[in-house]
């Protein structure tokens, strides 16, 4: 099987809340991996917001965004309807991870994380 690079882009999406101190999410600009391999995308919450819940979304070229999962600081996650088992979430401190295993052509997309104040 020939090595085929797969480019995954994940720009930042931040859902603003009414709190005084707004969380900031940091994501790397892009990642690439080959078909059949795994990739781990990171979304980091700013200081003082490490307990916030985030959501991961996928936007394939020419399509509307798709909700993938809600991810808590404990690492517990709930996936959206029809999201393949190849997609999983995990957490460590302020970092929230989206892992995609056994990469497929259709995984080439933009990946966004967003957060909100779960107390509002």
From Swiss-Prot:
Chain spans, region Framework-1: 22-46
Subcellular compartments: Secreted; Cell membrane
Residue segments, region Complementarity-determining-3: 114-120
Region forming the signal peptide: 1-21
Gene Ontology biological-process annotations: adaptive immune response; immune response
Sequence segments annotated as region (Framework-2): 54-70
Superkingdom to which the source organism belongs: Eukaryota
Region (Framework-3), start-end ranges: 78-113
Protein purpose: V region of the variable domain of immunoglobulin light chains that participates in the antigen recognition. Immunoglobulins, also known as antibodies, are membrane-bound or secreted glycoproteins produced by B lymphocytes. In the recognition phase of humoral immunity, the membrane-bound immunoglobulins serve as receptors which, upon binding of a specific antigen, trigger the clonal expansion and differentiation of B lymphocytes into immunoglobulins-secreting plasma cells.
Residue pairs linked by disulfide bridges in the UniProt entry: 43-113
Span list, region Complementarity-determining-1: 47-53
Location of the Ig-like domain: 23-120
SMART domains: IG, IGv
Entry GO CC: extracellular region; immunoglobulin complex; plasma membrane
Keyword set, alphabetical order: Adaptive immunity, Cell membrane, Disulfide bond, Immunity, Immunoglobulin, Immunoglobulin domain, Membrane, Secreted, Signal
Stored PROSITE patterns: IG_LIKE
Source organism phylogeny: Eukaryota, Metazoa, Chordata, Craniata, Vertebrata
Subunit: Immunoglobulins are composed of two identical heavy chains and two identical light chains; disulfide-linked.
Protein name: Immunoglobulin lambda variable 4-60
């Amino acid at each position: 099987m020939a090595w085929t690079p797969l480019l995954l882009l994940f720009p930042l999406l931040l859902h603003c809340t009414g709190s005084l101190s707004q969380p900031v999410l940091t994501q790397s600009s892009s990642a690439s991996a080959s078909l059949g391999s795994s990739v781990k995308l990171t979304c980091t919450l700013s200081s003082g917001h490490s307990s916030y819940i985030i959501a991961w979304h996928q936007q394939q070229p020419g399509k509307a965004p798709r909700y993938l999962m809600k991810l808590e600081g404990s690492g517990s996650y709930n996936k959206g309807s029809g999201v393949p088992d190849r997609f999983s979430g995990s957490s460590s401190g302020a970092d929230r991870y989206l892992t995609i295993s056994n990469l497929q052509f259709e995984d080439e997309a933009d990946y966004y994380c967003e957060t909100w104040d779960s107390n509002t």
